[in-house]
Amino acid sequence: MTDISKDRFLDALEGVGRPVATAEQIARELDCTQATAADALAALAADDEVERANVEPDPVVWYPRDWLELTDRERIVPFPDRREIIVDQPSQLTRAQLSRVAHLTDTTRTGSYRYEVRAEDVWAAPFDSLSDLVAAITELLPRDCPTLIEWVREQWTRATRFRLRTHDDGYVVLEAATDSLLGNVAEQKLDDDVLRAPISDTEAWVAAEQVAPLKRTLYEAGYPVRDDRDLESGEPLAVDLHLDLRPYQQDWVDRFEDASAGVLVGPPGSGKTVAAMGALESVGGETLVLVPSRELATQWREELLANTSLTGDQIGEYHGGEKRVRPVTIATYQTAGMDRHRHVFDDREWGLIVYDEVHHIPAEVARRSASLQSKHRLGLTATPVREDDKEADIYTLVGRPIGTDWDALFDAGFVAEPEVEIRYVPWRDDDDRYEYAAASGHTRRRLAAENPAKEAEIEHLVDQHGDTQALVFVDYLSQGERIAERLDAPFVNGETPHSRRETHFDQFRTGALDALVVSRIGDEGIDLPDAEFAVVASGLGGSRRQGAQRAGRTMRPGSQSLLFVLATRGTEEEDHARSRMRHLSTKGVRVTESDASHSP
């Protein structure tokens, strides 16, 4: 008799699409005879695993003893024509796998997730071959989806139709797969000054200053360009890394070496900065590092001094507080984006440009980056998502994503998987509720964000986790001041002098502070390794990037990290909170929801 376990029976029910089935239907799903299925089902019934019912004159039907076993099971339903995948109750592994090939578009409170497979997802999928990508998709889906797979094959092929290379004489060549693509796509789409002259029926000479516009134009036309040019290594700079890279970090560096440009995508705490130092060692040329803040510039300097052979006189910072250009220069995006400081891009023969928190790249810096296409380029981010959806800026100006499954990092213990909980807080009283109902626009959103009842909930959570340092994020200064006073903690915001910021950050790192309240300046890569417990009191609308960054402040190795996201019950803030956590859901992080435990 063929062995049919309860799990195989439940799988068969899903294939049938009904909660009850006959032995004939089960046999058809499991590819066995009806007699074999009937005997196996009878054995399961004898073990109290399934139930049977006579529904004469119809045949006997079989169903699970516990109906919840059906509703709580993971179920994946593909819609190939729409290129959508709906998943109910997905496991952490399933969500992590889906994040490599699809884009999460919606979630529900009942545990359903909707993914869309976009052309950009296929182009940026972290697979070395089409067969590997197809295998990953087919392994996820419960049935064959030939139309979806065929579309994926077409998109993968489109990403190989155009290639940039360096001619033996040193100039840039655009190479098309066919003469039709060169004539009917490239020559038709590109401005007249991009292609200087034809070389053959499938090749053209590219103006060096037009490489970035070429890549952007063809990307928007549906043909991402493979960039195989020989890039400049700049003025030589010998650098030795004093750390051993983790296996996935070495893989990042190896893949960057092969491509000469790309974006490292990994959770905070995974060591992207260390991997970037490995890339600096590999390129062996003078390097410009661009960062969002002065604090990050200082951290980069300290990390380089501690972990490489670079000396203090080889590293310069370029921002509002200091302006020194050295073989390795760390500049803020804000300063580098100013017209009067544009010379920082040209002062030295840079061999490598590093864009830390690359999703923050301002338009001014992006435009100037268009002239840096001959340099090695490396972006670092926990999420390449930009809320204005300008992913093409990052893809074409810096490079395609180079990533590692978050799930693998969690399992290996390199990064702490946060426990994320969205807590819905009621209004403090009817007066607050009525004021919200009468308001509109920004005032309405701010009232929900600054709901006074959140302050009591935060105090309760901090008391409940009293043996752990607490980090509290706010978006509004007045709210931050009230919470800081309630917790007897410092409040660090954009108005806090840099010297005092560093004092408070050092106090938090060393354990001298039990709690710290921060505004948006704490969203980025400021290193707070002991922040194992965090509360988000208010957030930037539905910003997925901000959600990932704030959760990332707790994602450090060797810790049990907790993140609570507060949202006012019965307001649009509920949807915003779920949206902010959506990116974490795509990466395999389990996000739960509950009501506030401390009522006003």
Curated annotation (Swiss-Prot):
Source taxon at top rank: Archaea
Q: Where is the Helicase C-terminal domain?
A: 457-600
Q: Where is the composition biased (Basic and acidic residues)?
A: 590-600
Top-level enzyme category: isomerase
InterPro entries, sorted: ATP-dep_DNA_Helicase (IPR050615), ERCC3_RAD25_C (IPR032438), Helicase/UvrB_N (IPR006935), Helicase_ATP-bd (IPR014001), Helicase_C-like (IPR001650), Helicase_Rad25_arc (IPR030882), P-loop_NTPase (IPR027417)
GO molecular function terms noted in the UniProt entry: ATP binding; ATP hydrolysis activity; catalytic activity, acting on DNA; DNA binding; helicase activity
Q: What is its EC number?
A: 5.6.2.4
Catalytic reactions of this protein:
Couples ATP hydrolysis with the unwinding of duplex DNA by translocating in the 3'-5' direction; ATP + H2O = ADP + phosphate + H(+)
**Binding-site residues, ATP:** G266, P267, P268, G269, S270, G271, K272, T273
Pfam families, sorted: ERCC3_RAD25_C, ResIII
- Would you identify the family this protein belongs to, as annotated? Belongs to the helicase family. RAD25/XPB subfamily.
> Could you tell me what this protein is called?
Putative DNA 3'-5' helicase Rad25
